[in-house]
Amino acid sequence: MLTLSPAVRIYLATGATDLRRSIDGLSALVRDRFSLDPLSGHLFLFRNRRGDRLKILAWDRSGFWVLYKRLEQGTFAWPPEPPGAPVEMSNADLLLLLSGVEIAQTRRRRWYERVA
């Protein structure tokens, strides 16, 4: 399970990405296509054409991480936006995506905390 700071932003690359790319190729993609800094400490998610594989690029002050997930059945529920600027998502949405839940189908309920 991933535990992320609330300050970490999560960017999802729309469209398909050639997942033969590794750290250098994915960080160049973040820098050139999205005009974002791969050394920012934020997470960048990429999906292959079939939709059954996912890579997450992250920087943690001492080096890059690449997390890779391959589904044995099914596909990741990816937003239908055309390739272009990345879509920002919340930590909760990332956990839902990795669990196989289609984010567009979920309905959020409001939660209130008692202040006093």
Where do the protein language model's features map onto the residues?
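Polybasic/polar functional segments that serve as interface/processing modules
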Residues: 1-116
